[in-house]
Amino acid sequence: MKTYSAKPAEIEKKWVVIDASGLVVGRLATIIAMRLKGKHLPIYTPHVDCGDNIVVVNAEKAVFTGRKKDQKVYYHHTGFPGGIKERTAKFVLEGRFPERVIEKAVERMLARGPLGRKIMGNLRVYKGPSHPHEAQQPVALDVAALNRKNVRN
């Protein structure tokens, strides 16, 4: 019997919506990364984009455990000599684009090649409770119910 290899044409992508209110960022990101890759499916094929389209709402209400909100630092470089810049997770969460915390957490759990970039295109993160993807009829995924450690009150 030959090993099954999924073809891109025969994959049916589902739409999933996740409410990030009170969820721990790292635990949420692992679940999102797994579903984006399609590893929860029996037809998972490593070289094919077979995961779901995921919509995350209330990204600004996601939480860190411990003192990570103050101690976790995001670095970027301007390209100029000595141009390394840093921002704490607290600064990013309270800033203009708090959804970037979840985007970065998921992005760093995926491969950094062409397929990883394509898979990241299937993730949509919004800071508020509304999103423009109601026409796709996304199914709600209750991450808090999967494990009691996924949520902080």
Curated annotation (Swiss-Prot):
A biological-process GO annotation: negative regulation of translation
GO MF annotation list: mRNA binding; structural constituent of ribosome
Subunit structure: Part of the 50S ribosomal subunit.
CDD domains the UniProt entry points to: Ribosomal_L13 (cd00392)
SUPFAM superfamilies per record: Ribosomal protein L13
The protein's name: Large ribosomal subunit protein uL13
GO cellular component, one term: cytosolic large ribosomal subunit
UniProt entry keywords in alphabetical sequence: Ribonucleoprotein, Ribosomal protein
Pfam families linked to this entry: Ribosomal_L13
Function: This protein is one of the early assembly proteins of the 50S ribosomal subunit, although it is not seen to bind rRNA by itself. It is important during the early stages of 50S assembly.
Family to which the UniProt record says this protein belongs: Belongs to the universal ribosomal protein uL13 family.
HAMAP family assigned to the protein according to its UniProt record, in alphabetical order: Ribosomal_uL13
Name of encoding gene: rplM
